[in-house]
Design a protein with these regions (language model features):
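Von Willebrand factor
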Residues: 108-143
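Von Willebrand factor type A / integrin I
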Residues: 133-145, 151-233
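Short, basic, glycine/proline-bearing loop/turn elements
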Residues: 23-24, 117-121, 143-147, 188-189
Length: 233
């Protein structure tokens, strides 16, 4: 068990600025003369699902900076974070086919996830909705979902995310900007670039309209900075 915002009593600790007034243990204060607060156990997340896009379009960019490489690093970081919180994590990769690693906890699961990520290749064009439809029966209602994808060349993204949100899932979309990654290797006329950026922004805005938290991940932004926006999960 770990401390957090749950219901079950975990331990007493010293009062810190910002602690809720109602969490003060007045009996402990009467005995010790020191302000102490009740710390509760964190309610465990049932499962965390990470969907990583490994389609052919994920190769856009340089050898080291492309949606697949950026996405693989992000998936490893997110899974490690939740496994260290003692949550269970599932990994789904989709490109030419879907690969599913069922949710588990612990270091062994972390190793399995890293092994699967090390083997990914950019190929295929499997749509996201086909993947989420196949996975839906295996996902408990309300499970947090991370979708790591450039979102390019897939018209099913919007309905897939709408369906996930409709089933109570907290959805985070971490999207490497393939338009900006492409600029690293080829010259895009300014007008064309601006049109493509506007189309992408409209797509991201539409996704956020379904309640998803959307991160437009630029090539020059470190993963840690991008993930600052999802700490509330």
């Amino acid at each position: 068990k770990t401390p957090g915002q749950g219901m079950e009593f975990y331990s007493l600790r010293e009062y810190l600025p910002g602690d809720a007034f109602r969490s003060i243990n007045w009996k402990a204060f009467a005995k010790t003369g020191e302000l102490m607060v009740n710390e509760k156990t964190r309610d465990a997340v049932t499962d965390v699902f990470i969907f990583l896009d490994t389609r052919d379009v994920s190769r856009i960019g340089t050898v080291l900076k492309n949606p697949l490489e950026m996405g693989t690093v992000a998936a490893a970081s997110v899974s490690n974070y939740f496994i260290r919180r003692r949550d269970s994590v599932a990994l789904v990769t989709y490109g030419d086919k879907m690969n599913f690693l069922p949710a588990e906890t612990g270091d062994k699961q972390n190793y399995k996830i890293l092994s699967q990520l090390a083997a990914v290749e950019a190929k295929g064009s499997m749509p996201l909705q086909a993947v989420t439809n196949a996975m839906s029966p295996r996902m408990s209602r309300g499970s947090p979902v991370f979708i790591i994808s450039s979102l390019e060349g897939d018209g099913t993204t919007l309905p897939a995310i709408r369906n996930l949100a409709g089933k109570g899932h907290s959805v985070v979309v971490l999207s490497p900007s393939s338009i900006d990654l492409e600029r690293l290797v080829s010259r895009i006329p300014r007008m064309s670039y601006e049109v493509l950026k506007l189309e992408r922004q409209n797509r991201l805005t539409a996704i956020s309209g379904y309640g998803a938290k959307v991160i437009d991940w630029m090539p020059d932004v470190e993963l840690s900075q991008a993930l600052l926006q999802v700490r509330s999960v």
